[in-house]
């Protein structure tokens, strides 16, 4: 399979929620319809995924979004046999992420704050089972090399059909 580089529209959206209640802070932050900041890769050199809990029970979530043109991949009718997403690690050597299907960005329009929950299956009270997982949980992260994430059948089928 050829190497495909993400489009220039990729980037991150984060939501930083201040002064939220102790019992509902995480859910409110995770379920927010919009982010408080967004950066495209052309503007901001790093993207990432993180969740941070401040001492005041304030949560901050950053989600990275990537767009790929997979039209040049020649797949048999039953889809690609294997596919690997490679992301170069920079800082923070811990991981607890899952690659999921998103509806934004596309290859011509960059990421914006309103794209925070542009995740296939998202609704105002979503949980992990509502999303379309493209990988198993990633539990380790290399901060000075490419991290290879094996994409599952759902991702490979979408690569062949989109």
Show which residues each predicted segment covers.
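Flexible, small-residue-rich N-terminal segments that precede or flank a structured functional core
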Residues: 1-72, 105-109, 119-123
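A short beta-strand element within beta-rich, extracytoplasmic domains
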Residues: 64-68, 78-91
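Beta-strand-rich interaction/scaffold domains
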Residues: 90-161
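Hydrophobic beta-strand residues in large extracellular and virion-surface proteins
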Residues: 4, 49, 85-87, 97-102
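Stable alpha-helical elements in mature extracytoplasmic
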Residues: 61-64, 79, 151, 155
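A near-ubiquitous, low-amplitude feature marking generic local secondary-structure context
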Residues: 47-53, 84-86, 132-142
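Extracellular/lumenal carbohydrate-interaction signature centered on repeated Trp-anchored short motifs
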Residues: 59-60, 70-82, 161
């Amino acid at each position: 399979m050829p190497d495909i580089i993400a489009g220039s529209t990729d980037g991150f959206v984060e939501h930083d929620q201040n002064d939220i209640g102790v019992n509902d802070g995480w859910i409110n932050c995770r379920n927010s319809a919009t982010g408080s900041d967004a950066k495209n890769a052309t503007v901001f050199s790093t993207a990432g995924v993180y969740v941070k809990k401040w001492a005041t029970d304030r949560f901050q979530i950053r989600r990275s979004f990537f767009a790929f043109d997979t039209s040049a991949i020649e797949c048999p009718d039953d889809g690609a046999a294997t596919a690997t997403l490679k992301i170069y690690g920079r800082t923070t050597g811990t991981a607890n992420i899952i690659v999921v299907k998103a509806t934004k960005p596309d290859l011509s329009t960059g990421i914006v704050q309103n794209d925070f929950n542009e995740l296939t299956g998202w609704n105002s009270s979503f949980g992990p089972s509502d999303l379309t997982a493209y990988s198993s949980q990633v539990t380790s992260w290399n901060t000075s090399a490419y991290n290879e994430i094996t994409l599952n059948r759902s991702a490979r089928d979408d690569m062949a059909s989109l």
